[in-house]
């Protein structure tokens, strides 16, 4: 039976032609196969015109030997050159022979070695080599006139001083830096700036003939006596101006070795007047009612006056002198004695014509607990501590102001004032004021003492 499908006949030489183009593509391995096939057939047509008598098989064979082999060799050579090209150094671009006038400036024409003169903080080998030239240029006007040079640096930048072999210290102050660069000040002088002024403080002597100062000291001390807790806080602001005349004309006056910054020495007065002013206040409470009484006095020594200043060198002592027993129905009237000692003494020239006066105002706060005194254990008094103290329930205060006037013992008025002083009984816990001082008058806000609960 005959099939209806048509039979396809492969023309002669098609298989050979397709095999030849496939081999050429495999050998050369082109990037664009379509373009390579078009070139292949064009070259094959040209080659066939010269060899028309050859069979298609022989024609493809000779064409491959003459053309395709060369194409394959050329491709391999090109690939090797592409691999070797990155290894070759890039060509050096030629330098421009001329510059445009718009960008050509005088700074571009300055020689390279001249820039090394601007380095002032660190030495360099070039600076050591040219140190002789710079030194000659620096001392040229004194020795002999120097001839002008074409490559001389402009006058705005002076030549630096000779650089040493080691590193030079550069001061922070611009004035000292300029002086060091000009050679007027040696480099070792700038080492003084390295001293830390924040940690170095001058020591003030204890004995000062003329001084003006203001200080504020807070002292607190816990006291427990016969079942009653007493907390004393002394806040004093003292200001004094002491002017003392010379002891003898032959002896030179002494001055403070460390004066305050920006303060001039006050002139010495001829009159040996001594005036001391101290301010202090005393306040105390017990069950929200002020009950304390205090005496502040200044101890006088012949030829010396003890100034009652309160600072780090002085001690303020508060002692409980007298107190009613816990079971007593009488009102509790504790009495406090404040004795202020000082390490600062001022020698005073004795002169009957001049009087020495002292004004004292004291401020203190005595805090007592509001709890009942019954059943409270008796604890010995603890020493004065300026940092820690016991807290109590009430913190109301009583302010007292006292004024004390001290008259020279040589003055007859002193005897009269001492005679008018009230005598003290043997049981009085307060001793009489030394040196014939009168007892200061106390002015409490409330005189009635509270009774025990």
From Swiss-Prot:
Phosphorylated on tyrosine residues during in vitro capacitation. Dephosphorylation affects its ability to bind calcium. GO terms for cellular component: cytoplasm; cytoskeleton; cytosol; motile cilium; nucleoplasm; sperm end piece; sperm fibrous sheath; sperm principal piece. Keywords: Calcium, Cell projection, Cilium, Cytoplasm, Cytoskeleton, Flagellum, Metal-binding, Phosphoprotein. Expressed in spermatozoa. Residues 86-165, 246-278, 406-453 are annotated as: Disordered. Pfam families: RIIa. Residues 143-154 have a biased composition (Low complexity). Residues 12-49 form the RIIa domain. GO terms for molecular function: calcium ion binding; enzyme binding; protein domain specific binding. SUPFAM superfamilies: Dimerization-anchoring domain of cAMP-dependent PK regulatory subunit. It is found in: Cytoplasm; Cytoplasm, Cytoskeleton; Cell projection, Cilium, Flagellum. Interacts with FSCB. May function as a regulator of both motility- and head-associated functions such as capacitation and the acrosome reaction. May bind calcium in vitro. This is Calcium-binding tyrosine phosphorylation-regulated protein. It comes from Mus musculus. The gene is Cabyr.
